[in-house]
Amino acid sequence: DGSPVMINLVHDIDILRFAIGEIVQAKALRGRSQRGAVRIETGAIAFGFETGAVGTVAFSDVTPSPWGFEAGTGENPNIGATHQDMMWITGTKGALSFPSMTLWQGEDWGQAARKIPTTAEKNVKVPLDAQLDHFLEVIDGAEPMIDVADATKTLEVALSLEAELAGQSEMGNVQV
């Protein structure tokens, strides 16, 4: 019964905070229900980061595609892997595609961006198994990879967006 904000988007928020910085502003737009559900099914978010960067994310759990997180990363054996990128982070000197970690460099619009060779560390463990193993290690006294304060910041952003979206009526046909 949960929405894709708390099930899926929360992980994108984690990645964005890690890669770009703290989120200081967010504006949400709710899409129309496709299944007739009361819960949020689809929407878009505009983010502002303390670094001055801005970003957008579209999300949906009613649009099967090759560009979802699990499909792209292959992390969940229950979801078909496509290994297609699902996130693109661009800046003034280049761009990075995720999860392929393809790096593009270019500062001049008159020149084509150059693909920069990178070597990403390959994890041989099934990520869900690695998460459970780490959880068990933490129970045994190991330091967690992510502390409670960091996780709380991501949760605060996700809950704020969920509340904003829940307060909106479905997007209808709007004349602009």
Predicted regions and their residues:
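C-terminal helix-rich "cap/oligomerization" subdomain common to oxidoreductases
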Residues: E50, P99, H134-V176
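Acidic/polar loop patches that form or flank catalytic/metal-binding clefts of enzymes
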Residues: E22-A28, V54-G55, A95-P99, P144-M145
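Predominantly a Rossmann-like dinucleotide-binding segment in NAD(P)-dependent oxidoreductases
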Residues: D1-F47, F69
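A general structural signal for well-ordered alpha-helical segments in protein cores
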Residues: D12-I13, D129-D133, A158
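Active-site rim elements
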Residues: G2-V5, T119-K122, A142-M145
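Hydrophobic/aromatic residues within well-ordered alpha-helical segments
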Residues: A19, P127-Q131, T154
